Amino acid sequence: MASILLTPYYSKHILEAFNSLWGRTALILFLFVVLACSWSIAPYGMQLGMVGKYFKLIYLPVLAVGFTNPKTRKWCLNGYLFAIFITCVVSILKSIQIIQSFDPGEVFYNHIITGFMTGLGAYLAGLFAFQSKGWLRVLYSLLVLLTSYQVLFINSGRTGYVLYFILMGLLLFQQISFKRAVVGVLLLCGMFTAVYEVSPILQERTSDLIKDIKQLQAHNPNTSIGYRIQFHNYAKSLWLAHPFTGIGTGGFKYSFSLDKPVPAWGDTLNDPHSQYWMTLSEHGLIGMILLILFLGSLFITSMELTETRPVLLGILVAFCIGSVSDTILCYSTAGYLLVVMSALCFGELIEKRTSDTIAESNFDILPDNNSGNPIHA
């Protein structure tokens, strides 16, 4: 960040980045979070803590300027895939007990985020496999197999399963014809059915889901899904109390500690396990509209991209899916991933506009070729 701000070549484009559609929506969303502190009942420490979690939005325009070099973008994406490769290797070593671990699918943060990032890694590896030739295509294809194995045979995060399926479907529809993509999705469904028959962890997590649903039907809400539903319902009650502005930044955690709405859980909960309910409860309809505008600006701008459009669409779809069951913009490394990947993609846009500006400037200073022609004298 400091090197970008202090380097004249990069810093001259920062104002342009902030003045873009995505730069403005990110800034407005952050400023509204700051403004929402004025009506929050939470202690100042909690308010500042939440403001800090949204501050990553300000990184987006600044980081985008640092990704104007295509080689930098390429190295960054391949660096991410290398990190996912290491993650898969560590996960496999855990699964065969070479590295002792309670949950082999949890390599960093938790199994949900590990599955999220590995599923995205499978998508990116598949994208590069389509775009590459020769040994590189083979290498990326092998990485697709490795990441698929981690998600479907080791990871215990159900979000990862859903994300993997949707991203692979998205990849097919982007890279091949519609008819072939439909056939590919049908084959993907068949693959999931076959994997279910041979994957103990997939069977176990599906069985857990069915058990949770049965427990809910038996009026026992204190299960994995039941807790989430209770958290969502509590966030909904906070939102309905202040539908337009919410209860203010940091208000969810503080209100939960006072009300203790889920006795079996206790009095400490940072978030309602949903970015959408978190936004509605703390910042109301206004905050939700601003969040949708921010995400919408990313999608709209993706249509202007060429090289990195599939990358941005992939992380955007992954974020929107993950936000249903987790507060990933605030309380997850996936929030940083959205910002960094979006910035990487928008670096292409800044590069294009800079090149166009230089080309126009060079054209304007060209001498009039007809000035010395006697016919036109």
Predicted features and spans:
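Aromatic-anchored transmembrane helix interface
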Residues: W22-L31, P43-G66, I84, C88, ...
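Transmembrane alpha-helices of multi-pass inner-membrane enzymes
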Residues: A2-L5, A194, L312-G322, I328-D368, ...
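Hydrophobic transmembrane alpha-helices and their immediate junctions
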Residues: T25, F178, E282-V317
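A membrane-periplasm/extracellular boundary helix in multi-pass inner-membrane enzymes
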Residues: Q175-H219, N233-A241, T249
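Transmembrane signal-anchor hairpin modules in multi-pass inner-membrane enzymes, especially those
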Residues: M1-L35, I41, G45, T68-K74, ...
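Long extracytoplasmic/lumenal interhelical loops at the membrane interface
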Residues: A218-N233, S237-A241, T245-H283
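Alpha-helical transmembrane segments of multi-pass inner-membrane proteins
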Residues: A2, V62, T72-Q100, Y109-I176, ...
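Membrane-embedded alpha-helical segments of multi-pass membrane proteins
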Residues: M1-Y10, M50-V62, I113-A122, Y161-G169, ...
